[in-house]
């Protein structure tokens, strides 16, 4: 068979596939117009930087996991607030039945426009996620948490019954269905997950996450969230510092980390972020115990600097704008290298 005949047959086959399944069902990669990944902010500049693309990607699956009370739900709620600020619609699948409306409100969420579901079983929760992703109207769905997605077989059985692998099979099947419509409809799904320890592991990391390997495979981004120290005010504990590590990233360089401060009842401290990033980028200069801005000492100690940024909106926004400009410059320089 000649080369001309081969090309002609291939052209006919491609035309037939497009006619049968639509123009976007098959194409030559070079003919596909380059599309920048659409993102929305996580609500934290430090996390946006660590993700490498400026925020969470649209149309993807994201897993946020870590020990209890490490800040996983707080990070997810901040993401919901950011989506709502852009005029988007978000849903919260509360499998743990533990959402605090007042805390969500404190983080900037419009609770009157947040879709909430508290499902009775894992199947029901994932069916709801699947249905919502197909509407094309939902921008973000948060599932809290994978560990609480109990299969019907386990719920209907007795306490002594062991249903091995039921949750992993449930997750794998659901993710196969959900993934197909996510990218097409631009819906992002954040799965919050817990940590378990494997029994009998002597060498290597004994930690694992519930739900089997399916979520690890289908997630475009996986964030490992850990508390590193407490934040105190006098004798009172007011929050904790959290380290977020990007352990998987299909869209940028993985293994970057972000440090944030989560304050009880308030969420991620924006003033702490501005203070940290401002110093890292040379906008704020430490001179002994003092911090200087534009050559002038403005605060003595990190605590006073954070208080100043909290109370001085003009200064906060001025430094924030400079941080954003500096980050854009750094990104452009890295792209030209």
UniProtKB/Swiss-Prot annotation:
Superkingdom, natural source: Bacteria
Major localization listed first in the record, in broad terms: cytoplasm
GO cellular component terms listed in the entry, alphabetical order: cytosol
GO molecular function terms listed in the Swiss-Prot or TrEMBL record: ATP binding; ATP hydrolysis activity; ATP-dependent DNA damage sensor activity; damaged DNA binding; single-stranded DNA binding
InterPro entries reported for this sequence: AAA+_ATPase, DNA_recomb/repair_RecA, P-loop_NTPase, RecA-like_C, RecA-like_N, RecA_ATP-bd, RecA_C_sf, RecA_monomer-monomer_interface
UniProt signal peptide: none
Entry binding sites for ATP: 66-73
Localization: Cytoplasm
Gene Ontology biological process terms from the UniProt entry: DNA recombination; DNA repair; SOS response
Disulfide cysteine pairs (residue numbers): none
Keywords: ATP-binding, Cytoplasm, DNA damage, DNA recombination, DNA repair, DNA-binding, Nucleotide-binding, SOS response
Record-linked SUPFAM superfamilies: P-loop containing nucleoside triphosphate hydrolases, RecA protein, C-terminal domain
Claim: Membrane is one of the keywords in the record: no
Primary role: Can catalyze the hydrolysis of ATP in the presence of single-stranded DNA, the ATP-dependent uptake of single-stranded DNA by duplex DNA, and the ATP-dependent hybridization of homologous single-stranded DNAs. It interacts with LexA causing its activation and leading to its autocatalytic cleavage.
Recorded family membership: Belongs to the RecA family.
Protein name: Protein RecA
């Amino acid at each position: 068979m000649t080369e001309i005949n081969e090309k002609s047959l291939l052209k006919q086959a491609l035309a037939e596939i497009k006619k049968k399944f639509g123009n976007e069902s098959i194409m030559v990669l070079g003919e596909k117009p380059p599309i920048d990944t659409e993102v929305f902010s996580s609500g934290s500049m430090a996390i946006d930087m660590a993700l490498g693309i400026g925020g969470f990607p649209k149309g993807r699956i994201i897993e946020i996991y870590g020990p209890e009370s490490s800040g996983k739900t707080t990070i997810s709620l901040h993401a919901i607030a950011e989506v709502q600020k852009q005029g988007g619609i978000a849903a919260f699948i509360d499998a743990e039945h533990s959402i605090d409306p007042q805390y969500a409100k404190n983080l900037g969420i419009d609770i009157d426009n947040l879709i909430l579901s508290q499902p009775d079983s894992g199947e029901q929760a994932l069916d709801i996620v699947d249905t919502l992703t197909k509407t094309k109207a939902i921008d973000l769905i948060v599932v809290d948490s994978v560990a609480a997605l109990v299969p019907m077989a386990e719920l209907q059985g007795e306490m002594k019954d062991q249903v091995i692998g039921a949750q992993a099979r449930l997750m794998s099947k659901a993710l196969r269905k959900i993934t197909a419509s996510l990218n097409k409809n631009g819906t992002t799904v954040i799965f919050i997950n817990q940590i378990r320890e494997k029994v009998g592991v002597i060498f290597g990391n004994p930690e694992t996450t519930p739900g089997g390997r399916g979520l690890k495979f289908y997630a475009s981004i996986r964030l490992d969230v850990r508390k590193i120290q407490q934040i105190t005010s006098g004798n009172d504990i007011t929050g904790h510092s959290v380290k977020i590590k990007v352990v998987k990233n299909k869209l940028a360089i993985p293994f970057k980390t972000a440090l944030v401060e989560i304050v009880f009842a308030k969420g991620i401290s924006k003033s702490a972020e501005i203070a940290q990033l401002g110093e890292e980028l040379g906008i704020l200069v430490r001179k002994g115990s003092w911090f200087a801005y534009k050559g002038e000492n403005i605060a003595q100690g990190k605590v006073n600097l954070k208080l100043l940024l909290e109370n001085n909106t003009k200064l906060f926004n001025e430094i924030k704008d400079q941080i954003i400009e500096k980050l854009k410059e750094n990104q452009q320089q890295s792209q030209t290298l």
